[in-house]
A protein has these predicted regions:
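Long, contiguous C-terminal flanking segments immediately downstream of a protein's structured core
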Residues: 70, 74-180
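Glycine-rich beta-solenoid repeat tracts in large extracellular/virion proteins
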Residues: 1, 15-23, 28-38, 56-63, ...
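Right-handed parallel beta-helix
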Residues: 1-19, 23-54, 66-78, 109-116
């Protein structure tokens, strides 16, 4: 799996995190079928600050994979159209070339996210399903998070403070920087 944490994503319309889900000859959704990272994506999207995400949403897609969306801070900006959208859950369309079955959704653990003017734990209120099929909402929710590996987890509010304090290029130069 992969962990994407403590990042500042700002002023993007088409570059918000896209969770790819399952790929490469996917064999179906079962407990035995996800032993290989080639079979299913496992992603931990945690402690990020999303700002001014344009016409889309904080992240999207995720077909067939297992994902955490935890303690992120969403602050809309002047170009943000959907001001309360945490995630847009995709599903496969069955188009030619897709390797996973039609109408395959991902599985998501969504918890502790903050959306400006909506407050703490906005979470599933900020999720839309691509095809509007709200009947799948309970089947795609994970009760427990995917193992994120070793990562320090902060509240969404603390994430906002820490990411703004440390994101971007620093002026401090160490010995490696000084050689250039």
């Amino acid at each position: 799996g992969a962990s994407f944490h403590h990042n500042l994503l700002a002023h993007h319309t088409n570059r918000c995190p896209r969770l790819n889900g399952a790929r490469y000859g996917w064999g179906g959704s079962s407990a035995d079928n996800y032993a290989s990272s080639i079979e299913a994506e496992q992603v931990d999207l945690r402690n990020n600050v999303m700002y001014n995400w344009g016409k889309g949403n904080g992240a999207y897609a995720g077909m067939g994979g297992y994902h955490n969306i935890v303690n992120n801070y969403y602050k809309y900006g002047p170009a943000t159209k959907n001001k309360d959208r945490v995630f847009q859950c995709g599903h496969t369309s069955g188009a030619s070339g897709e390797v996973i079955p039609k109408n395959t959704y991902g599985h998501f653990y969504i918890d502790g996210n903050y959306v400006r003017d909506k407050g703490e734990n906005y979470d599933w209120k900020g999720v839309i399903i691509d095809d509007g099929n709200t009947t799948v909402r309970d089947t795609i929710k994970l009760k427990e998070p995917v193992n994120p590996g070793v990562v320090t987890t902060h509240s969404a509010q603390k994430t906002f403070e820490k990411v703004l304090a440390y994101a971007g290029a620093s002026y401090k130069r160490d010995a490696v920087d000084a050689r250039y």
